């Protein structure tokens, strides 16, 4: 069974209605429990270095995410970073420089609708990210 590190950073995927808009509110554990189809498929460890709207993601946060990956690198077969979509591409680019040459897959995922929305894409996005990260033969050299 693959051991995967799920890194929760916030974003729409972790958001709930608060006041006059969405705000990151759900923990990584709550997000994983929202997708019962993953139970028993992976040995899943969850860390949450931050829970922010991705418009507030800064270079120091990229360094923290990279540090979390490095800290868990030897113990895990792959990594899924749950992230807001506004700045996901910037974080992915930063991580590609901060963690070069990794034979272990690192996938970033998010959603357009929060996990609690009945029309959310969050559940399938998280599920497919975990499926993809477990297929190491898809990793590019």
Predicted features along the sequence, with ranges:
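Acidic, glycine-rich active-site loops and adjacent beta-strand->loop/helix elements
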Residues: 52, 85-87, 110-115
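Short Gly/Thr/Asp-enriched flexible loops that form oxyanion-binding sites at enzyme active sites
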Residues: 82-104
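Conserved small/polar residues in nucleotide/adenosyl-binding loops
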Residues: 136-141
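Short acidic/histidine-rich motifs immediately flanking catalytic phosphotransfer sites
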Residues: 75-77
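Active-site glycine-rich loop that binds ribose-phosphate moieties when present
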Residues: 122-133
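N-terminal glycine-rich anion-binding loop in soluble enzyme alpha/beta folds
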Residues: 2-73
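Short glycine/serine/threonine-rich phosphate/pyrophosphate-binding segments
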Residues: 15, 87-92, 125-126
